[in-house]
Amino acid sequence: MSSPELTYDSFSKYFPFAPTALCIKECARLEAMRQLQVEGPILDVGCGDGLFAKIAFRAEEVWGIDIDGKEGRWAQASRAYSQIVLGDIAEVKLPPAFFRTCVANCSLEHVPDIQAALSTISASLVPGGRAYLFVPNRDWASKFLTVRTLRSLFGERVASVLQNGIDEFFKHHHLYDEDGWRNVIAKSPLSLVDIKPVLSTATTVAFEAFLLPSLAGWANKKLTTRWTNFPGLRRAAAPFAYVLAKSMLAIANDDEKTAEYLLVVERPREPE
């Protein structure tokens, strides 16, 4: 890998509380976040259990918002946030012109009314405040080895059935290429500062490799609201799991950024 999408520092903090497949993707986003200038107060959209924010942010004031009350309780317990808001980002009322930074970590693609969500974010930012939005590439699932194998053996129609099924499983309401995401932002009150591809094909291949065993964590979350039950044991196993994850990234050996986009947008400054 030409860039450290997966480091032990991030992995060892994430792995005790999340399945391997999720760790790989989240750690790659963490590395991308470390290249950004993030100033508080911060709004974390789709904050989940708060683990990402606890590792990523050092600001004194971080607010989290999530539509899921169970996730909100875990977020509160994480002590990563000064405030937790339970509600739909497309409908909730937030303090106007309050946040200097907003981060949406692969959450907006799950919001049916994405324009309403972007309007809420814009109104909550100070003029000139920035939002960093991680969103999926329309064709991210086409890089799954199983999808590529089906395509080579049986053609595009058969492969697309599995590819579409993957996106349905992850409840993606919005999947666009770069031009599509540009159009989404153009229709919103926000201004596009930059858009760049992030997360390599290798992370998708590694994600797929660990997806089936990680489904046990998904089932556990449905039953208990948490990904893992024994964080202490997983912490001890983190070095071994990290070697396996890094090995899969090396086997995939594809640095092309095909999985997601990082949209850098800002609330326009008011004319003087």
Name what the model sees in each region.
Residues 106-110:
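Short catalytic micro-motifs in class I SAM-dependent methyltransferases
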Residues 112-120, 130-264:
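S-adenosyl-L-methionine-dependent methyltransferase catalytic module, highlighting the catalytic core
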Residues 1-97, 101-104, 118, 246, ...:
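Conserved N-terminal segment of class I S-adenosyl-L-methionine
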Residues 129, 271-272:
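Short, charged, solvent-exposed linker or helix-capping segments at domain edges/interfaces
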Residues 41, 128-130:
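Short glycine-centered segments of the SAM/dcSAM-binding site in methyltransferase folds
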